[in-house]
Swiss-Prot record:
Residues given in the record as ATP binding sites: T63, P64, A65, G66, E67, G68, K69, T70
Keyword Isomerase in record: no
GO biological process: tetrahydrofolate interconversion
Family the UniProt entry places it in: Belongs to the formate--tetrahydrofolate ligase family.
Protein name: Formate--tetrahydrofolate ligase
Catalytic activity entry: (6S)-5,6,7,8-tetrahydrofolate + formate + ATP = (6R)-10-formyltetrahydrofolate + ADP + phosphate
UniProt-recorded Gene Ontology molecular function terms: ATP binding; formate-tetrahydrofolate ligase activity
Highest classification ranks of the organism: Bacteria, Bacillati, Bacillota, Bacilli, Lactobacillales
Keywords associated with the record: ATP-binding, Ligase, Nucleotide-binding, One-carbon metabolism
SUPFAM superfamilies for this protein: P-loop containing nucleoside triphosphate hydrolases
Keyword ATP-binding among UniProt keywords: yes
Enzyme superclass (EC): ligase
Organism encoding this protein: Oenococcus oeni (strain ATCC BAA-331 / PSU-1)
Length: 553
């Protein structure tokens, strides 16, 4: 079979204006970035009514290679369109860090891809660069304020705002700023990856440009010497940050290999942020099609939970159905099989791994919406193992199950899934929030630990206790909680797989993200700046004399 990038190069994209016309957008409502991608003028569709149903795609805890959520999402959108309905995919923008690191690209795979995959995976329309620029302008303003006399009496030991870079670079996690007599006060700081920036979270949760500016204004960058918050509004740079982001607020329109419309916008990671695409993009998809199909990062314990508890209240629309993606390989992995033996037949390991799938099914059914299981089939999967999974889902759990082969078969590999998803969205059920908005932060964390992770309780480090006291003192104690933890486990220990019980989640810090509107609880050893592996994906990427890129996947 051809590589992803070879398949991409074999398909001629339609002019992006043609894709716009498919969903009722005139040329004047598009801001082209070349011939195959464009921004949608969000203001031009602001007053349109929503007409679509919302489908959320999430997964079980993934293997390091991922479960193929994006591939399944793309195949599902293509299939719904082939069935005579209109569907738009709403995806996150890939970060270049993982593209050059372990994961590779994030535009689907095989015959279920969005294009142009090189552009989307690399610079795209510049949104992530804009977030980096805005974030680092704010960092520069903070250090300049310290250098110019510190009128706001910022406590240098209580500055939350670090710098960001859209790259995996562990060497920048801890740095010293201001070395040298004329370079400002010396202090310890560091870099995080851009996807973890609060400005990325703000961009993805803002409803329009006015909301964006308002949220930017209330970002808390530090505490002063009396323990009071210092905000962007105090530093008088909300307007400057908004100016950098004024085009980035508009969502990006591209197409699949099958010429289905996709809106790709925003890219926060689900393990260190809320892990969803933008409210603006999802809202646009709901206005322009019968079905808006979106995904949330990593497993349902991370992106799925945060979509329901953080994004849904802002979007004002809950999913009409949830698709949980699983693979035979991941179930073997959670059943105790080593990574280099996942292709070996092992029915017992699959049976043991069903506990992990079951935990994710229980987590999503807490919200009351219909759940469909999509098994992303690999060529070497054994049918006995697949039948075991099917029997568990349909027999024991009484849920819909379908095999997906979009990677090899394109839209045809998702037609049966599409039929079941469409049927599921007709099954109207009340949405049940996991917790009440006015619950305490402690109660929210305990609820997530018990009902989503399947754990027993949580404990706070001394630093976390101090952080929580500051959060409550400043009146932020009722905000939603985003737990930052490993995606590889239901616990905060990446080495513990399957579906353990009786465990404790260890919260080491609380970080207020007041512009975004939530509090981040840092659990375990999760890092805000990833590192590269021994053999990063960057080693496989090349460009020929004609400018054609190879090695992206």
């Amino acid at each position: 079979m051809k590589s992803d990038i070879e398949i991409d190069h074999s398909i001629k994209a339609l002019p992006i204006t043609e894709i716009g016309k498919q969903i009722g957008l005139s040329d004047s409502q598009l801001i082209p970035y070349g011939h195959d991608k464009a921004k949608i003028d969000a203001y031009s569709i602001a007053n349109m009514p929503r007409q679509g149903k919302l489908v959320l795609v999430t997964s079980i805890n993934p293997t390091p290679a991922g479960e193929g959520k994006t591939t399944v999402t793309i195949g599902l959108v293509d299939a719904i369109n082939r069935l005579g309905k209109s569907a738009i995919g709403a995806l996150r923008e890939p970060s270049m860090g993982p593209v050059f690191g372990l994961k590779g690209g994030a535009t689907g795979g095989g015959y279920a891809q969005v294009i142009p995959m090189e552009d989307i995976n690399l610079h795209f329309t510049g949104d992530i660069h804009a977030v980096s620029a805005a974030h680092n302008l704010l960092a520069a303003v903070i250090d300049n304020h310290l250098h110019q006399g510190n009128e706001l009496k910022i406590d240098p030991e209580n500055i939350y705002w670090r710098r960001v870079l859209d790259m995996n670079d562990r060497a920048l996690r801890q740095i010293t700023l201001g070395k040298g007599r004329v370079n400002g006060p010396e202090r310890n700081s560091g870099f995080d990856i851009t996807a973890s920036s609060e400005i990325m979270a703000v961009l993805t949760l803002s409803k329009n440009l006015f909301d964006l500016k308002k949220r930017l204004s209330r970002i808390v960058v530090a505490l002063d010497v009396q323990g009071k918050p210092v905000t962007v509004a105090d530093l008088k740079v909300a307007g400057a940050l908004t100016a950098i982001l004024k085009d980035a607020i508009n969502p990006n329109l591209v197409q699949s290999l099958e010429h289905s419309p996709f809106i790709i916008h925003g890219g926060p990671f689900a393990n260190i942020a809320q892990g969803t695409n933008s409210v603006v993009a999802t809202d646009a998809a709901l206005k322009l099609a019968d079905f808006a199909v979106t995904e949330a990062g990593f497993g349902s314990d991370l992106g799925g939970e945060k979509f329901m508890d953080v994004k849904v209240p802002v979007l004002g629309k809950e999913p009409d159905a949830v698709v949980i993606v699983a693979t035979v390989k991941a179930l073997k992995f959670h059943g105790g099989v080593a990574l280099d033996h996942l292709s070996d037949k092992n029915v017992d390991a699959v049976r043991n791994g069903l506990d992990n799938l079951n935990r994710h099914l229980e987590a999503m059914t807490h919200y009351g919406k219909p759940v469909v299981v999509a098994l992303n089939k690999f060529l070497d999967d054994d049918m006995e193992e697949i039948q075991l999974i099917k029997n568990f889902v349909e027999g024991e759990k009484k849920l819909q199950f379908e095999i997906v082969t979009s990677f090899v078969d394109g839209f045809e590999g998702s037609l049966d899934l599409a039929k079941k998803v469409i049927e599921a969205t007709d099954n109207q059920r009340f949405f049940m929030p996991l917790y009440q908005a006015d619950d305490s932060i402690e109660n929210k964390i305990q609820t997530i630990v018990e009902k989503i992770y399947g754990g027993k309780d949580f404990e706070l480090s001394d630093r976390a206790k101090k952080d929580l006291a500051e959060v409550k003192e400043n009146g932020w104690g009722k905000l939603p909680v985003v737990i930052a933890k490993t995606p590889n486990s239901l616990t905060d220990d990446s080495k513990i797989h399957g579906a353990p019980t009786g465990f404790t989640i260890h919260i080491r810090r609380f970080i207020p993200k007041i512009g975004a509107g939530f509090i981040v609880a840092m659990a375990g050893k999760v890092l805000m700046m990833p590192g590269l592996g021994k053999n990063p994906a960057a080693e496989k990427i090349d460009v020929d004399e004609n400018g054609k890129i190879s090695g992206l996947s």
